[in-house]
Design a protein with these regions (language model features):
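Positively charged n-region of N-terminal signal peptides that target proteins for export
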Residues: 1-5
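Sec-dependent N-terminal signal peptides
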Residues: 7-11
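C-terminal motif of bacterial Sec signal peptides marking the signal peptidase cleavage site
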Residues: 14-17
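Extracellular/lumenal and peripheral-membrane lipid-interaction modules
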Residues: 19-197
């Protein structure tokens, strides 16, 4: 009986060591992955759905009226929520693992929002996967001091119907769980792209 117990403990120890090694390899492989902008989906402005809008003229009168009211409101708040989809490419032959990330979103050199997301992703060796990140910020608050036209253009750029492009930098710092402990890479990885028509 004791021999069986010792054998079981030995098996668990070996399995745990292998699991930690797998987590280490997965974390390292993720640091070698390439992150690229893919798309923005699920865009809402003050609760108004702007997904799949091809042009301002394509908006129905009711939606347009709601947008005008939201822009003109003196409440000082204009929540913008969306899903940022990143393409993650793994150049390694082994799987890459991610347990979460910290992020900083900057648009035209202005910081819009920061945060931490606990979201697991696995990318197969020599493969790619889409990492969907749910984000949001108060467009009026972060655009304080700018003109109404600048605010409109920022929001319409997210919908792909803006008149002037917005330069976006999304900085990410991947987090990994190894042996029950959480670690992160020492510096942020920048993902840059432009929002326009």
């Amino acid at each position: 009986m004791m021999k069986k117990f010792i054998a079981l403990i030995g098996f668990v120890a070996i399995f745990s060591a292998c699991n930690v090694a797998q987590q280490l390899y997965g974390a390292y492989n993720m640091t070698q992955c390439k992150f690229d902008f893919k798309s923005i989906s699920g865009l809402t402005v003050d609760g108004i759905n702007l997904s799949n809008v091809n042009s301002i003229s394509a908006l129905n009168p009711l939606t347009l009226a709601k947008l005008v009211a939201a822009f003109s409101s003196s409440s000082g708040s204009l929540p913008l929520n969306f899903t940022l989809n990143l393409n993650v490419s793994n150049p390694n032959p082994q799987q890459a693992l991610l347990n979460g990330l910290s992020y900083i979103l900057e648009i035209d050199d202005v910081q819009m929002t920061t945060g931490t997301i606990e979201q697991q992703i696995e990318v197969a060796g020599n493969g790619s996967s889409v990492l969907p990140l749910t984000l949001g910020f108060d467009a009026k608050k972060v655009s304080s001091g700018q003109s109404l036209e600048s605010l409109k253009n920022l929001i319409f750029n997210f919908a792909g119907i803006g008149s002037n492009p917005s330069n976006v930098t999304f900085r990410i710092k991947p987090n990994f769980t190894i042996g029950g402990n959480t670690f992160s890479v020492p510096s942020y990885i920048p993902v840059t792209f432009t929002l326009h028509k």
